[in-house]
């Protein structure tokens, strides 16, 4: 269920959003990051993912989002649950007048790069980086780097 922009703004202003993030690994042990074109985290490299819609099961959201973000429809059983995370942003999808709060369910899985059909709606570029390279880059958003930092994983529910 997609909301009108005004209604969605009320939701984002008032409540946390639920989303899925995908920690996608290739056969070389590199991880997929896309350069975000939209707020929040605009201009940063970020793992693929997206919001769960109202009345959408996690299984359906996983399949919809893997198709939308990777061009490859995968069942939720393809992913290893990677914990419950919290993401806080100073801006929102429409500007800087209120913050955004996400409760994020992480899923990690391996894919064959050749199977992916990466879209350009949410990201204007993609890269595969080793965990060391993405941790060393200030252009990778802190919320994505956290998935690879042992001290950030400590105490994360589900890990």
Curated annotation (Swiss-Prot):
It comes from the Bacteria. GO terms for molecular function: GDP-glucosidase activity; GDP-mannose mannosyl hydrolase activity; identical protein binding; magnesium ion binding; manganese ion binding; protein homodimerization activity. It catalyses: GDP-alpha-D-mannose + H2O = D-mannose + GDP + H(+). Keywords: Hydrolase, Lipopolysaccharide biosynthesis, Magnesium, Metal-binding. Changing residue 36 to Q: Increases Km for GDP-mannose 9-fold. Reduces activity 24-fold. Mg(2+) binds at residues 49, 69, 122. One of its GO terms (biological process) is lipopolysaccharide biosynthetic process. Gene3D superfamilies: Nucleoside Triphosphate Pyrophosphohydrolase. Homodimer. This is GDP-mannose mannosyl hydrolase. It comes from Escherichia coli (strain K12).
């Amino acid at each position: 269920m997609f909301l009108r922009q005004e209604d969605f703004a009320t939701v984002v202003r008032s409540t946390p959003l639920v989303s899925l993030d995908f920690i996608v690994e290739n056969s070389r042990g590199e991880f997929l990051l896309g350069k975000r074109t939209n707020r929040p985290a605009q201009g940063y490299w970020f793992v693929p993912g997206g919001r769960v819609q109202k009345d959408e099961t996690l299984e359906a959201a996983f399949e919809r989002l893997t198709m939308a973000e990777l061009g490859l429809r995968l069942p939720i059983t393809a992913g290893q649950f990677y914990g419950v995370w919290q993401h806080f942003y100073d801006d929102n999808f429409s500007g800087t007048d209120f913050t955004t709060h996400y409760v994020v369910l992480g899923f990690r899985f391996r894919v064959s790069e050749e199977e992916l059909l990466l879209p350009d709606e949410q990201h204007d570029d993609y890269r595969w980086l080793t965990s060391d390279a993405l941790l060393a880059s200030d252009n990778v958003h802190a919320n994505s780097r956290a998935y690879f930092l042992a001290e950030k994983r400590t105490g994360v529910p589900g890990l």
